[in-house]
Each structure stands twice: as C-alpha cells, then as structure tokens.
Swiss-Prot record:
Major role in the synthesis of nucleoside triphosphates other than ATP. The ATP gamma phosphate is transferred to the NDP beta phosphate via a ping-pong mechanism, using a phosphorylated active-site intermediate. The active site is at residue 117. The gene is ndk. One of its GO terms (molecular function) is ATP binding. PANTHER family: NUCLEOSIDE DIPHOSPHATE KINASE, NUCLEOSIDE DIPHOSPHATE KINASE DDB_G0292928-RELATED. The keyword Cytoplasm applies. SMART domains: NDK. ATP binds at residues 11, 59, 87, 93, 104, 114. This is Nucleoside diphosphate kinase.
Amino acid sequence: MATERTLSIIKPDATRRNLTGRINAKFEEAGLRIVAQKRIRLTKDQAEAFYGVHKERPFFAGLVSFMTSGPVVVQVLEGDDAVARNRAIMGATDPRKAEAGTIRAEFAEDIEANSVHGSDAADTAAQEIAFFFAGVEIVG
C-alpha cells in the first residue's frame, strides 16, 4: 500500500455540534494520522474558489453559503491509501445511503450538512491540501 495524504474538512454542521474530537477519533481508529489541522472560517471568496469545480451546478450558491456559515476544521490526513480509506470512513455523500458506522451515517444532518468533505483522488488531494496549507504546516 502507498502512503498518501488527503484533505479533510469538518464542516460547519459538525463544528457547531462539537463533533471534531469524535470525527478525529474515527480517522485515527482507521489508521490515519492527522499531520496538519486548523480551525478557520471560510470567506465567500475562499469557498467559491475551493468549490469552483461546481460553479455551474444548481447547488453551488447553497454550498458556498453553508460552508461560510460557521467555522470548519481543515486537516491533512496521512496513511496507507489515505484517499480511499478516508472516503470509506466518511460514507456516502447522502447520509441516508451511508453505511452504519461511517461519519455521515452517524453525524450528518442531511445531504448538504453531511459533516465532512474529503478529497476524491490523489491528484485533487494535492491541490486541495495546497489550497489550505503551506508545506511547513504539515508535520508528518
């Protein structure tokens, strides 16, 4: 297995309910290490840039509004096959379809307020990590 890094964002619905520690425990229990982490409040410009791939989608404005509605925790997770492992831990985007024991099955409120974001591939993970972190902020 290849050691990888992936980006995770604990979304405003989860930070509002003080779930950061419980979500981090799930990452660590699955063998992922948190090698960088910071709590921030995304600006509208940051959210629009980060989610720019969805700009033409009907849900874009709502997504930007939600992601700027409260603090988020951005973090870099590291481990064997980190991208796939994180996606498995998160569960399906729609929490009604998420497997029991996944973050979204356990904590998500709905398809938008689904508690976490995770990179979908190694190349996007590298781009997403660079969006939020300078190399010196990642301590492996």
